[in-house]
Regions:
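Non-catalytic helical/linker scaffolds that mediate oligomerization, partner binding
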Residues: 1-355
């Protein structure tokens, strides 16, 4: 039986914490687990220990990735796991550290608030939800929700187009999390919101030589400096959520292909991530567009594809992994057949020329 070549990363979360589910998704094709350090990691050390035992039991090498929060903007904690914000409702982002509710949430970046203009749009949760600024002062932004079915939870990412973040170094939290990741035995460190190679070099000084660095490409500046970033990194992740907001959704397919080609040319593994099987968070079956998205990444030459909320908090984590694995196998089989056909055609032409 043909085994898949492309790897699958599954994001750790409550949906797959049990040993039974971990064992099942590893047997279905998961090769690595991602820990999102932007969220609460209480109890994760125990889960990693569980993964290491399964690694030995199943005789399969499993990587663990520590995905650092970095300087990516995020909202604070919210009182409910799923807080619904109504369409056209007023909603405030402020510097108050109190737990958020359906009227406001903490946005602890006064230096960013000062830069935002009335009329600006704020994108939350990898661009899923949009808010428009209608009032502001030094400590808060009053917005109107422009999205239907807006459901927020704690620590979700925030992206504001055309606002430059003047930081390009590890935060105190990142440095602390690197120490935690080392103690946990993580194999990889993923760096968020990379702009150039500086952050990679700083991280390299803090980790052992056997820990790899994954640079997440999420903005125009990173694309501009892509060659130096690829050269200094051990792998690249195309984080399409924030990237789409920064460069425009219609530009992402082209940029994805270009980044995959550049990584191949420099012999660096490349990961395609974000919303690959997003509908399977709720639904047992994927959309045809999602299947095509996974297949396209494999056709283009991606070495790894990643599941995020699908495995972390989704209702169908096992089915999501099964779907991704099956799609990879089908696509790789097709690629192999056609490469073999192409080689046979070339050989036949050579024989004809000789005769």
């Amino acid at each position: 039986m043909m085994e898949k070549k492309a790897k699958i990363i599954a994001t750790l979360g409550p949906a797959i914490y049990s040993e039974k589910k971990l064992k099942k998704i590893i047997s279905l094709g998961v090769d690595a687990f991602r820990i999102n350090f932007s969220h609460d990691i209480t109890g994760v050390k125990q889960i990693i220990s569980r993964i290491r035992k399964l690694e030995n039991k199943l005789n399969k090498r499993i990587a663990v990735i520590a995905d650092l929060q970095g300087i990516k903007l995020r909202i604070g904690k919210i009182s409910s796991d799923k807080l619904r914000i109504k369409y056209k409702q007023k909603f405030t982002f402020d510097t108050n550290k109190k737990i958020g509710n359906n009227l406001r949430v903490c946005f602890p970046y006064s230096f960013i608030i000062n830069k935002i203009k009335i009329g600006s749009k704020i994108f939350l949760d990898d661009g899923k939800f949009i808010f428009k600024v209608i009032e502001k002062n030094k400590k808060s932004l009053v917005t109107r929700c422009l999205s239907t079915n807006c459901i927020l939870s704690s620590n979700k990412s925030v992206h504001i187009p055309n606002i430059k973040i003047p930081l390009n170094r590890l935060t105190k939290k990142d440095k602390k999390d690197i120490s935690i990741a080392k103690r946990m035995g993580c194999n990889w460190i993923a760096l968020s919101y990379i702009q150039n190679s500086d952050l990679i070099k700083e991280t390299r000084k803090l980790i052992n030589s056997d820990i790899g660095i994954i640079s997440k490409i999420e903005n125009k500046i990173a694309i501009k400096n892509i060659k130096e970033i690829i050269n200094e990194s051990d792998a690249i992740m195309i984080a399409r959520g924030d990237l789409a907001i920064d460069i425009g959704h219609s530009e992402v397919p082209k940029v994805q292909l270009e980044l995959i080609k550049k990584c191949a040319a420099l012999s660096k593994p490349v990961i395609v991530a974000t919303q690959m099987l997003e509908s399977m968070i709720e639904n047992a079956s994927p959309t045809r567009a999602e299947i095509n998205d996974v297949a396209t990444a494999i056709f283009q030459g991606a070495d790894v594809v990643m599941l995020s909320a699908e495995t972390a908090i989704g209702k169908n984590p096992i089915q999501s992994v099964k779907t991704m694995s099956k799609t990879i196998l089908s696509t790789e089989k097709y690629k192999k057949q056609h490469i073999d056909e192409f080689k046979s055609s070339i050989d036949a032409k050579k024989d004809t020329m000789k005769s």
